[in-house]
């Protein structure tokens, strides 16, 4: 109905029907092809509210003694007791939160989100030396890579390049792939899982 209205804006009756009967599933990646711009704005507004609450909870969690001792700095998920789970920079999910902040900044161009993205991104810088994971690609590319894409600042680029140098140490020329996991060596000789594909983007970009 909305697509018909776009073709003929005079048919406001179609727009009224669309608004009355629409069912939006944000999990449907094709949904954004035909939803109204207002709906995208509303989705980002909702995301901003969630991220602001997450940042508030994260700031509180970072002050807890156990998290400070174990250098847990980035929010990841909710624990069973309802508390916020914060993680070490080496956790494979560490780049998702700062990456989400950069995505919101890219859409809103609001300096508030830029500053929050900068702060949360640099919290995981040390991961650029972490050779124990194949997930370094999307850990650092979603955060520092997105930061460089949006700002052009050399400092972000340098981190991504070092991350790529670290990740390529997991490459085996005989297998022609980076190694996925280091554990369970008694079961797997050289594990390569499909997630590897998400980590190659940073390597291709770096070359």
Where are these regions (language model features)?
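Glycan-recognition and catalytic cores of secretory/periplasmic carbohydrate-active enzymes
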Residues: 1-207
């Amino acid at each position: 109905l909305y697509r018909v209205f776009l073709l003929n804006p005079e048919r406001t009756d179609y727009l009224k029907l669309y608004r009355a009967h629409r069912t939006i599933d944000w999990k449907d990646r094709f949904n954004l092809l035909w939803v109204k711009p207002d709906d995208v704005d509303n989705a980002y507004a909702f995301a901003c509210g969630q991220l602001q609450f997450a940042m508030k909870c994260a700031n509180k969690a970072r002050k807890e003694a156990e998290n400070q001792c174990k250098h847990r700095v980035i929010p990841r998920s909710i624990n069973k007791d309802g508390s916020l789970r914060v993680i070490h920079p080496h956790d494979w999910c560490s780049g998702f939160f700062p990456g989400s902040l950069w995505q919101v900044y890219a859409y809103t161009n609001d300096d508030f989100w830029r500053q929050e993205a900068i702060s949360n991104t640099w919290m995981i810088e040390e991961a650029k030396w972490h050779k124990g994971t194949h997930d370094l690609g999307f850990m650092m590319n979603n955060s520092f890579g997105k930061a460089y894409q949006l700002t052009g600042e050399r400092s972000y680029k340098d981190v991504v390049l070092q991350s790529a140098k670290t990740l390529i140490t997991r490459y085996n020329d005989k297998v022609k792939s980076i190694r996925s996991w280091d554990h369970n060596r008694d079961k797997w000789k050289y594990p390569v899982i499909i997630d590897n594909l998400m980590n190659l983007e940073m390597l291709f970009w770096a070359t």
